[in-house]
Amino acid sequence: IGIISVLILTLIIGLLAFKTRNDQWNVWKLNKDITFYNNSPLLSTADGPYFLNQAKYLNQNKSVSLHLEKRFFPEYDKEIGKNNSNDEDSIFNISLLPITINYFSSFFNNDLLLAANKLIPISALITAMSITVFFIILGFGYEGVVAGLGASLSQSIYVRTSVGRVDTDLLNIGLFYLILGLVLASIKVEGNKKKLTLICIAGFFNFLFTWWYQHPGFLIPFVFTLVLLQFFNRQKLKISIIQIILFLLFSGPFSVIGSFSNLVIFVNEFLLFASR
C-alpha cells in the first residue's frame, strides 16, 4: 500500500507541475497583445532564439552550419578554413531541444514558437517526477514527494522553466536526477542481470542528456558516483567493471571522449592561470 500511495502522489506532483505551467500559458493567452506576435507566443529568455533558429533551419531542411556561420562570424569562417571542410555538423552536435521542437511543430501547423512553449508543461511534469523517483530509490518515498513538489514549484526552478523559457534548463535537472537515480538503483537492486540492465538504461539517458545539453562533462561525476557506490556497497569487482564499461558504452563514445577532453582543457587552463 505504501509504495502504491507514493507512486500515486508522484503522479499527482507531476500533474501539478504540469498544471502550474499550463495555467501560466492560459494567462499568456488572455494577454495576447503583450505575449503574442502574429498569433505566435513570444519568448522570455535570451537563449530561446538560438534554439528556435536551429529548429527553423531543421524545419526548412537547411544546413544548421549556416546558422552557426552567421552567429559566430567571422570566427566560424576561420575555423572552417582551417579544417578545409564544409561538411554538415553531425545531428548529435545539434541539441536535442531544437530537434524536438521541429518534430512537434508538425502537430501545431509548423508553428515553432507554439510547439516550443507547449513542450514546457510536459518538461515540468518529467522533471518533478524524476526528482521524486530519485528520492524513492534512496528509500525516502514520502520525502521524495515533498522534494518533487518543492523543487518543481521553487522560485529558482519555476522561473527558469516557465512559459517562454525555451532553453535546455527545461530538462537539465530532471535528466540529472533521473540518471543518478538509475545509477543508484543499479547498485541497490539484487541480481546481476537487473544491475546490468539498469546501468545500461542509465547510460542511455546520459547519452540523451549529453545530446540535449551539449556538455558531456557530467559523465565524469556520474562515473565517480558509480565507483563510490560500488566501493561502499562492497560490490564484486567483476560486475563493477562490467557496469562501468556498459555505462560508458551506452553514454556514447563521443560523449566519453568529449568529457575527458573537456577535463584536460580545464586542467590546462587552470594550470596556466595558476602559473601567472
Regions found by a protein language model. Name each.
Residues 1-35, 125, 136-137, 144-145:
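Start-transfer (signal-anchor) and selected internal transmembrane alpha helices
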Residues 21-34, 40-54, 63-76, 88-100:
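Extracytoplasmic catalytic/substrate-binding loops of multi-pass membrane glycan-assembly enzymes
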